[in-house]
Amino acid sequence: MTFSSFEIFKKKSGTLIPISLNKDIPFKSKRIFLIYGNREFVRGNHAHKKCSQFFLPIHGKMELSVIDKKNNKKVKLDSKKGKGVLLKPLTWCKLSFKTKNSVIMVFCDREYEFNDYIENYEDFINIIKKKKK
């Protein structure tokens, strides 16, 4: 898990947070998607075998519950902070929205592949236990 910060330019007319795809996103993006949700909506609850994902909050606050072979923590994201987080493959992630009308953008280093998903938590734990050895 790696965090990235973005420069924030605030004026009375609004806030600008520029993002350079080739510089600020830590890989060449092959897929981008948006997730919309309201308070206490939960998404995710899975891991990827090969896909890395970069999560960037667009509007509102959200929390990622992240489990990998080194971490088991909750990561708070806020669109006003100009920060995103990179999750590598074999990272279990549960996304919880904490404010109304929250939006998060997710950049992926791979196209969608059905077989890349690990949706059973016990299977995931067994896989990362084997990787620790």
Predicted features along the sequence, with ranges:
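Non-catalytic, conserved peripheral segments adjacent to functional cores
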Residues: 1-85, 100-108, 112-123, 127-133
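Cyclic-nucleotide recognition modules
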Residues: 94-95
